[in-house]
Amino acid sequence: MIKQALISVSDKSGIVDFAKSLSDLGVKILSTGGTAKLLADAGLPVTEVADYTGFPEMLDGRVKTLHPKVHGGILARRDLPEHMAALEKHDIPTIDLLVVNLYPFVQTVSKEECTLEDAIENIDIGGPTMLRSAAKNHRDVTVVVDPADYATVLDEMRANGNTVGYKTNFRLATKVFAHTAQYDGAITNYLTSLTEQLQHRDRNTYPATLNMAFEKVQDLRYGENPHQSAAFYRDIAAPAGALANYRQLQGKELSYNNIADSDAAWECVKTFDAPACVIIKHANPCGVAVGANPHEAYSKAFQTDPTSAFGGIIAFNREVDETAAQAVAKQFVEVLIAPSFSEAAKQLFAAKQNVRLLEIALGEGHNAFDLKRVGGGLLVQSLDAKNVQPHELRVVTKRHPTPKEMDDLLFAWRVAKFVKSNAIVFCANGMTMGVGAGQMSRVDSARIASIKAQNAGLTLSGTAVASDAFFPFRDGLDVVVNAGATCVIQPGGSMRDDEVIAAADEHNIAMVVTGIRHFRH
């Protein structure tokens, strides 16, 4: 039964209402510093921890709750007579509810002007100590680290005579240990990233020790293949616009492959300003287009490769209206992603309950780093988020691209970044015309892209081509030009650049180089 609570929070959202409800239930409230003042100013009966322990706060607040009267009241097992006798001997009441969240360390060190001293002063000591004590003794103590749990605790107390059940206490305790582990991990990441100058602005991007925290979203039926088990986890700091923050409106449970392909589709479509549609199959774009509206964008994207689009993942960067929904509904679709769906579109897809509809906020946020597991290790790199601008391009041929060709080149280059290497992408008029992906030789990717266009009944005459890396020989260039391309965008940097550029001049096409590569493995 909860008779006494200790409340000390940095995040004060909802705390006054929560404390008032506790007081109304007859719970005595202990508190510290700013939290105590906030509660007292709200007219709530509150006892300062310093008055409770008989020992004042000291060392500029570094020592507040590190006292036997606090930790004894938290850690004592109520089922052990010797523990309870020790409390009685030293006149220590039990503390049955602990409500604590920690100094904002992560927010502090994320500021550019943060110094080591600022960071050190935001390392909480008393808070984690109390939290761990309460979580360890969760059989007897309810511990709350997240304001989202206030309502649950109050509901159980009201229903059960100020008692919170063991199942809830256990869940809250596991939440505490996850929280303190994350907190300590953030401290370790920060301290091991410091250079010899020990200033925040001189931090190494990659700390000596890397700690990451993820929370489980769901178990999955299986992994990439049916014999593999799997689960989906969300980065606790996932930005609003990330796939992990999706809201599923309808459809079957997402599979491992659905999630992986959906991420590829969403990250690609977010890069376009105009209404865009991206169709993904096996993590590769098989159709990308922009248009005046979602319907036009989808119609153009679908034309690229109708065969591969069957059972694909489709993403839009605009609301899916009824017209677009009617077009999409004619095909077999696994997942449909958009910032929103009109009511008419929702009603239309309600008749197709197997189609998974995902809404995701169209934010600019994306992962800061790209991670790849290898045997016994982890590769970490900054995200390939570079979007080349026209003024950054260098024309290396005698013929310069026309304004229309330049638009097509930039579109093709944007798509190529999301195609598995080796990547060759034909584009024209804001749509992909042929995509060659994942081949061991660039010339084979060029041939496949050409064949794909031919199979879809598309002409490549007058198209722009993007190559995610340089042409090592002229053979790949010859293939795309013979297919109909009139301009090419590529990184440059090959030992045979002169030979490739000479071939471009021989064909009288325009070629621009970006100076950056977009390998994707």
Curated annotation (Swiss-Prot):
CDD domains noted in UniProt: IMPCH
Keyword Transferase: yes
GO process terms (BP): 'de novo' IMP biosynthetic process
Keyword Hydrolase recorded: yes
Annotated keywords: Hydrolase, Multifunctional enzyme, Purine biosynthesis, Transferase
Disulfide bonds: none
Catalytic activity: (6R)-10-formyltetrahydrofolate + 5-amino-1-(5-phospho-beta-D-ribosyl)imidazole-4-carboxamide = 5-formamido-1-(5-phospho-D-ribosyl)imidazole-4-carboxamide + (6S)-5,6,7,8-tetrahydrofolate; IMP + H2O = 5-formamido-1-(5-phospho-D-ribosyl)imidazole-4-carboxamide
Residue span(s) of domain MGS-like: 1-145
A GO cellular-component term linked to this record: cytosol
Record EC number: 2.1.2.3, 3.5.4.10
Top-level taxon in the UniProt lineage: Bacteria
Annotated metabolic or biological route of this protein: Purine metabolism; IMP biosynthesis via de novo pathway; 5-formamido-1-(5-phospho-D-ribosyl)imidazole-4-carboxamide from 5-amino-1-(5-phospho-D-ribosyl)imidazole-4-carboxamide (10-formyl THF route): step 1/1; Purine metabolism; IMP biosynthesis via de novo pathway; IMP from 5-formamido-1-(5-phospho-D-ribosyl)imidazole-4-carboxamide: step 1/1
PANTHER family linked to this entry: BIFUNCTIONAL PURINE BIOSYNTHESIS PROTEIN ATIC, BIFUNCTIONAL PURINE BIOSYNTHESIS PROTEIN PURH
Family: Belongs to the PurH family.
Name listed for the protein in its UniProt record: Bifunctional purine biosynthesis protein PurH
Species for this entry: Paraburkholderia phymatum (strain DSM 17167 / CIP 108236 / LMG 21445 / STM815) (Burkholderia phymatum)
Lineage: Bacteria, Pseudomonadati, Pseudomonadota, Betaproteobacteria, Burkholderiales
